[in-house]
Swiss-Prot record:
It comes from Mus musculus (Mouse). This is Checkpoint protein HUS1. Gene3D superfamilies: 3.70.10.10. InterPro entries: Cell_cycle_HUS1, DNA_clamp_sf, Hus1/Mec3. One of its GO terms (biological process) is cellular response to ionizing radiation. The gene is Hus1. The lineage of its organism: Eukaryota, Metazoa, Chordata, Craniata, Vertebrata.
Amino acid sequence: MKFRAKIVDLACLNHFTRVSNMIAKLAKTCTLRISPEKLNFILCDKLASGGVSMWCELEQENFFSEFQMEGVSEENNEIYLELTSENLSRALKTAQNSRALKIKLTNKHFPCLTVSVELVSSSSSSRIVVHDIPIKVLPRRLWKDLQEPSIPDCDVSICLPALKMMKSVVEKMRNISNQLVIEANLKGELNLKIETELVCVTTHFKDLENPLLPSDSVSQNRHPEDMAKVHIDIKKLLQFLAGQQVTPTKAVCNIVNNRTVHFDLLLEDVSLQYFIPALS
């Protein structure tokens, strides 16, 4: 089992650092899946137990000038590593304006993801800064729980408003309640609502786009004004919004009535899917 990769392009390095920062805000620990063409950052707190799920995917050729890996076997040419997200984010922050970044799977008394950063001083001399990130190599029997989540057939799909504005609204609502209702319809309307014994507050967003859904979708027979809604933990929504440091190319919210909300984001050439289950 081997893995080594190198980034020399500064724009690619900064983009990879932004992705790592986002993951650190979304998940304390995550699984890094390494395959010949892709890297995935995965969080799979079982939906049945009330946890969120995340699937972040990037094509390795869009980031790395060199990329070599050998999985556990020819038939299973993949590697699954569990790591603390903040450790990777912290290591990459030292790489800003560096000449090159190398990532390698190593064993230094314990399994590590070793990040080597080549820094250049004002006198043009270079020095290497090395970070050894502790990891846990996951055995094959655990892989089945870490596959790409199947996308549920949603009742309503709607494009999100500006995420910074949405975050500002949700932050204010958190001071009133720890639960929130997110609801939307096929007329481009999205509401964020909190209800307590003393107060009911709703923020309305209108004239949003509804992406086209497959012709066999359950939403095809739905009245355009009917709201699909889901009752969620406001902290989980806020954590998702706080993780978005870059304006996405695409941001879609898919609601499965009273079951789950699925956020589908495209950040340049990185895709992010994030699932928040309904409160029971």
